[in-house]
């Protein structure tokens, strides 16, 4: 159930094993968090949810499929502009990145280089269940010494400049956690090391290309997909040996609560969701006029200024408040992909974190943050399409309250995702599995939740 990247990955894995597979999708189109559409004006193609895909680029499952995707890697993976007109630029080269950090260059190099060197040993753990016995405990312990710290603790202990601290803050804020939360630094470290491993690429034509490639592979293996098929109870499904659900824990309770054992059902009911997002997509009559010119070389831009400002923004969303100066995550794919907009025109994809379930219009605050680092941005806007948390959830039911991570990324929920079980994808019912981002390794487009769930199901059935 569910034709997002995890549902499709599960289906492909089952079909590769010779199983007869049918995917049921409630929406009229496939893709879940990897859909692309004309949201503003004709000819302007916007990613509805996910846009930049470092996880997809290193996914062992996607890599094994040899999907026909044209990956675009901008010269700069990530830019973090500052108020003085400069910007931190994260390039594929650790050395070139360190150079933009000035006095903190050596500290960055010492922090990141060993992790990049360890990536092949870290990947099996970081792209799978956290609670299982690690294959490479030495490499994992090296990562854990920094990753288990809070972002604030690691930043203050490692970096002397505002540039270094701000870079780590922005990367760690992808966790949706307060920057003082234990283990929050791990998210920032993984994203930064992936910038040097995979370069934070995206597929030409939009994220929809990933879902389309997976669907094509599934059909080539004999699998089928039905869109517009909303399932409200597992009792409505045709007879099946296995049912894999790319759904939230909340939805699984709705679908199967009457047949799930009480203890497991209550664990799912206690699952906590994190902050949501407010999203804005822009059709522009030209590129964003960044004050720091090199920001135009980046596919992704973090807009939040200093560590403390980003920290205030993330804590506000966590505590149910709306930040006056939100941390904004922005992608500018049309600078590198001519298929995204008509000739001479451009797109911008942006969101900020808000309280779960928020209905507040953050567009003016998002635009103020962009304008702060790119004076004249508002004059480039031709059209804007916004989405509140409710609209985000209506397009993808897994994003409960606008939470795009599949649940709050607390340390407890990283270990017990969504319940503490030897096989986290399994349920007490031997034929029923959950394979959404609420299972390991969590959010992002990599297909590993679905792939690993399907492998677990095949071992037991």
Feature-to-residue mapping (PLM):
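Hydrophobic anchor at the start of a short beta-strand
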Residues: 19-21, 243, 379
């Amino acid at each position: 159930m569910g034709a997002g990247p995890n549902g499709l990955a599960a289906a492909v894995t089952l079909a590769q094993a010779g199983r007869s597979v049918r995917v049921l999708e409630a929406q009229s189109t496939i893709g879940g968090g990897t859909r692309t559409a004309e949201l503003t004006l004709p000819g302007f193609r916007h990613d509805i949810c996910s846009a930049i895909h470092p996880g997809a680029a290193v996914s062992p499952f996607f890599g094994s499929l040899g999907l026909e995707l044209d990956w675009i890697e901008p010269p700069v993976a990530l830019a973090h502009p500052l108020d003085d007109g400069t910007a931190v630029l994260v390039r594929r080269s650790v050395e070139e990145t360190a150079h933009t950090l000035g006095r903190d260059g050596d500290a960055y190099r010492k922090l990141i280089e060993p992790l990049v060197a360890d990536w092949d040993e870290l990947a099996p753990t970081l792209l799978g269940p956290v609670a299982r016995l690690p294959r490479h405990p030495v490499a994992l312990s090296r990562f854990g010494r920094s990753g288990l710290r809070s972002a604030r603790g690691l930043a203050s202990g490692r970096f002397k400049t505002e540039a270094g601290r701000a870079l780590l803050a922005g990367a760690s804020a992808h966790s949706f956690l307060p920057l003082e939360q234990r283990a929050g630094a791990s998210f920032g470290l993984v994203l930064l090391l992936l910038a040097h491993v995979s370069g934070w690429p995206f597929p030409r034509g939009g994220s929809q290309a990933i879902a389309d490639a997976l669907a094509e592979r599934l059909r080539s293996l004999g699998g089928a997909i039905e869109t517009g098929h909303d399932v409200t109870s597992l009792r409505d499904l045709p007879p099946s040996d296995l049912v894999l659900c790319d759904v939230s824990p909340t939805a699984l309770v709705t679908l199967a609560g009457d047949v799930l054992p009480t203890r497991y059902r209550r664990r799912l009911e206690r699952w906590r969701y994190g902050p949501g997002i407010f999203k804005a997509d822009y059709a522009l009559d030209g590129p964003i006029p960044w004050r720091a010119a090199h920001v135009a070389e980046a596919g992704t831009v973090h807009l939040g200024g200093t560590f403390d400002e980003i920290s205030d923004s993330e804590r506000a969303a966590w505590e149910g408040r709306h930040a006056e100066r939100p941390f904004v995550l922005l992608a500018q794919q049309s600078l590198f992909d001519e298929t995204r907009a008509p000739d001479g025109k451009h797109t911008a994809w942006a969101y900020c974190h808000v309280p779960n379930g928020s209905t507040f219009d953050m567009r003016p605050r998002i635009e103020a943050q962009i304008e702060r680092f790119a004076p004249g941005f508002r004059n480039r806007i031709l059209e804007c399409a916004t989405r509140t948390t409710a609209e985000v959830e209506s397009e993808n039911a897994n994003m409960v309250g606008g939470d795009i991570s599949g649940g709050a990324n607390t340390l407890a929920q990283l270990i017990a995702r969504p319940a503490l079980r030897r096989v986290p994808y399994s349920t007490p019912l031997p034929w029923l599995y959950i394979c959404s981002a609420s299972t390991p390794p969590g959010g992002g487009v990599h297909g590993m939740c679905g792939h690993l769930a399907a492998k677990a199901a095949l071992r037991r059935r």
